[in-house]
């Protein structure tokens, strides 16, 4: 007997679940194709960049700078010579070197006007004051020397001369008494008492005795110094 052929049944109609999976598979395939296309385009772009890097770039010609103009320096020969300063007028000296200390004597009208002006100025400054005349210094007092004692102006010349002689003697006694332990006296009069007599006594006899005692005390100090 001949074998029996199996009856092939047609495939069952697709269900909703199968349709869903088929659509998902198609989407996956489409995405893969798109990704492949993207990769191809990236490869082409990278190849184009490599080719552009290998090709030499055209040289750019920069414009050459314009030559600077050098400033022309004028030569020394062409420059004009400096002008000389204008000459100042010569001034005549007022006085000679040997007459600078001398002054011309004022004329009579000028001297009279100066005296009148000085008198008016003095009266304006001291209208009520009286003119005082300075006492003249006697020739005897001037001969006594610069170390004279300055006492009353109305003192007689004789007593002033005695004071001027006593004072240097007292100063010499003071120099001799320095460093001496013992104070010497003449007629119970020491250096201090003689100094008071020289300053305050007004009688000529008293001053004469003071001078004699001062000279005796000075001699005593000198003798003591020679003994030492």
From Swiss-Prot:
<keyword id="KW-0426">Late protein</keyword>
<keyword id="KW-1188">Viral release from host cell</keyword>
<feature type="region of interest" description="Necessary for nuclear subcellular location">
    <location>
        <begin position="171"/>
        <end position="198"/>
    </location>
</feature>
<comment type="similarity">
    <text>Belongs to the adenoviridae splicing factor family.</text>
</comment>
<keyword id="KW-0508">mRNA splicing</keyword>
<comment type="function">
    <text>Promotes alternative splicing of late transcripts by promoting splicing at weak 3' splice sites. Required for the temporal activation of major late pre-mRNA splicing at late times of infection. Induces the splicing and expression of the late capsid vertex protein.</text>
</comment>
<comment type="subunit">
    <text>Homooligomer. Interacts with DBP; this interaction occurs at a unique vertex during genome packaging. Interacts with IVa2; this interaction occurs at a unique vertex during genome packaging and seems to potentiate IVa2 and 33K oligomerization.</text>
</comment>
<keyword id="KW-0597">Phosphoprotein</keyword>
<keyword id="KW-1048">Host nucleus</keyword>
<keyword id="KW-0507">mRNA processing</keyword>
<keyword id="KW-0118">Viral capsid assembly</keyword>
<keyword id="KW-0231">Viral genome packaging</keyword>
<comment type="function">
    <text>Probably functions as the small terminase that is part of the molecular motor that translocates genomic DNA in empty capsid during DNA packaging. This motor is located at a unique vertex and comprises at least the IVa2 ATPase, the small terminase 33K and probably a portal. Forms a ring-like structure of about 17 nm in which genomic DNA is translocated into the capsid. Stimulates IVa2 ATPase activity in the presence of the viral genome. Once the DNA is packaged, the terminase detaches: the 33K protein is present in the empty particles, but not in the mature virions.</text>
</comment>
<feature type="compositionally biased region" description="Low complexity">
    <location>
        <begin position="54"/>
        <end position="63"/>
    </location>
</feature>
<feature type="region of interest" description="RS-repeat; required for splicing enhancer activity">
    <location>
        <begin position="177"/>
        <end position="197"/>
    </location>
</feature>
<dbReference type="GO" id="GO:0008380">
    <property type="term" value="P:RNA splicing"/>
</dbReference>
<dbReference type="GO" id="GO:0006397">
    <property type="term" value="P:mRNA processing"/>
</dbReference>
<keyword id="KW-0945">Host-virus interaction</keyword>
<protein>
    <recommendedName>
        <fullName>Protein 33K</fullName>
    </recommendedName>
</protein>
<feature type="compositionally biased region" description="Low complexity">
    <location>
        <begin position="104"/>
        <end position="119"/>
    </location>
</feature>
<feature type="region of interest" description="Disordered">
    <location>
        <begin position="1"/>
        <end position="156"/>
    </location>
</feature>
<feature type="compositionally biased region" description="Acidic residues">
    <location>
        <begin position="15"/>
        <end position="53"/>
    </location>
</feature>
<dbReference type="Pfam" id="PF11081">
    <property type="entry name" value="Adeno_L433K_22K"/>
</dbReference>
<dbReference type="GO" id="GO:0019073">
    <property type="term" value="P:viral DNA genome packaging"/>
</dbReference>
<dbReference type="GO" id="GO:0042025">
    <property type="term" value="C:host cell nucleus"/>
</dbReference>
<dbReference type="InterPro" id="IPR021304">
    <property type="entry name" value="Adeno_L4-33K/L4-22K"/>
</dbReference>
């Amino acid at each position: 007997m001949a074998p029996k052929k199996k009856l092939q049944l047609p495939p069952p109609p697709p269900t909703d679940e199968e349709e869903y999976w088929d659509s998902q598979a198609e989407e996956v395939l489409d995405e893969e194709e798109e990704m492949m296309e993207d990769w191809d385009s990236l490869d082409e772009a990278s190849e184009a960049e490599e080719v552009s890097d290998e090709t030499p770039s055209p040289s750019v010609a920069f414009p050459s700078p314009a030559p600077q103009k050098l400033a022309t320096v004028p030569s020394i020969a062409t420059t004009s010579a400096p002008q000389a300063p204008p000459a100042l007028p010569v001034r005549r000296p007022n006085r000679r070197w040997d007459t600078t200390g001398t002054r011309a004597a004022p004329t009579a009208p000028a001297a009279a006007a100066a005296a009148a002006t000085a008198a008016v100025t003095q009266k304006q400054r001291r209208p009520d004051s009286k003119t005082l005349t300075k006492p003249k210094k006697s020739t005897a007092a001037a001969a006594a020397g610069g170390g004279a004692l300055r006492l009353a102006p109305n003192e007689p010349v004789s007593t002033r001369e005695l004071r001027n002689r006593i004072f240097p003697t007292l100063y010499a006694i003071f120099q001799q008494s320095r460093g001496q332990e013992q104070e010497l006296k003449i007629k119970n009069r020491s250096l201090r008492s003689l100094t008071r007599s020289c300053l305050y006594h007004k009688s000529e006899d008293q001053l004469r005795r003071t001078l004699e005692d001062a000279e005796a005390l000075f001699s005593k100090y000198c003798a003591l110094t020679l003994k030492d």
